[in-house]
Regions:
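Bacterial Sec-dependent N-terminal signal peptides
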Residues: 1-10
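C-terminal motif of bacterial Sec signal peptides marking the signal peptidase cleavage site
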Residues: 17-21
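Exported/periplasmic ABC-transporter solute-binding proteins
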Residues: 23-37, 42-47, 51, 55-112, ...
Length: 312
């Protein structure tokens, strides 16, 4: 994680005599994360990093930070990121964070094109998105919940294969799964959505023939949630933080969509929340925000929105 570099830099500023040695040490720590790291390995790395930075939240409020941090990308991180933004701006009144929820793919593209300072993604980066110098920081984990309308009492559990069959159009009626004789109203996300990309990959939708042309698409977790809440025969998928009593989450092969199950890997539909950036695109304020995202203050925000912390 690049955040270790910033901690080392802070130590160097405090102990001026060791500045040169620390600079050399920082250089040896530079590395770009792989596109799809194992959840357990990610968790171990993130846990170690967060332990080193959890007590450093006050450092973000140095009073010397100023400027604008431009972040674009995932809508799944919207609630978490907006609260982190508010907290960080309160600590640093001269810093403003401009966050645009444009979807993970768009945020990553903006980062690669250096349109933003930091990209936010709710999926691992693909091989063709990994370029020299691109850095990643996992700041939380999330699970993707499959939801139906609460009136759909007969359906409580589903498998990944059944999801692929529904979303590819092979299964079109709830009766085929032991439910009511009613046509399934399939709700998906827009093409640029990181949640959609992760969902389709996790259920093997490409191998099943791709998304059915009969699927309705909604831009954002909220609209998907609303569509399912309004239609007794609908099925959709959202981040865990969008589960409430207006929809009913299904178990996946008997495993409940909980934070513990997602972090451990027992729950099949889980993914990381991460930032991606280039060193030369991130200002001092941006570096401080990346550090803040792993602090206890920020991780408490993750928890408050049903996310899974890097130390959990």
């Amino acid at each position: 994680m690049k955040i270790r570099k910033y901690v080392a830099m802070a130590l160097c500023a405090t102990v001026a005599a060791s500045m040169a040695a620390c600079g050399n040490s920082n250089d040896t720590q530079k590395e770009t994360q792989p596109a799809a790291a194992d959840n357990t390995a990610d968790a171990a790395t993130a846990d170690s990093t967060a332990d080193n930075t959890a007590d450093n939240a006050s450092d973000a409020a140095s009073g010397d930070l100023s400027g604008t941090i431009v972040i674009t990308g995932s809508t799944s991180v919207e609630k978490i990121l907006n609260d982190m933004k508010d907290e960080f701006e309160a600590l640093n009144p001269d810093v403003k964070i401009q966050y645009t929820g444009s979807g993970s793919s768009a945020g990553i593209k903006d980062t690669l094109n250096k349109v933003n300072n930091i990209g936010a993604s709710s999926r691992n980066l693909k091989d063709d998105e990994l370029v020299d110098g691109l850095q990643q920081e996992v700041f939380a984990y999330d699970g993707i919940a499959v939801i139906v309308n609460p009136a759909n009492e007969a359906i409580a559990d589903i498998t990944e294969e059944q999801l692929a069959d529904i979303y590819s159009g092979k299964i079109t009626n709830w009766s085929e799964l032991g439910g009511n004789d009613a046509e399934i109203f399939v709700v998906s996300r827009e093409a640029s959505s990181g949640t959609r990309s992760a969902f389709e990959e996790l259920i093997g939708l490409e191998d099943a023939g791709g998304l059915t042309e009969n699927a309705a698409t909604s831009e954002g977790n909220g609209p998907v949630q609303a569509a399912v809440a309004e239609n007794e025969n609908a099925i959709g998928y959202v981040s865990f933080s969008f589960i409430d009593d207006t929809v009913k989450p299904l178990t996946i092969s008997g495993v409940e969509p909980t934070a513990e199950n997602a972090k451990s890997g027992a729950y099949a539909l889980s993914r990381p929340f991460l930032f991606c950036y280039f060193d030369d695109s991130v200002t001092d304020a941006g570096k401080a925000f990346l550090e803040f995202a792993l602090s206890q203050q920020a991780q408490d925000i993750v928890t408050s929105h049903g996310g899974i912390t890097v130390t959990e």
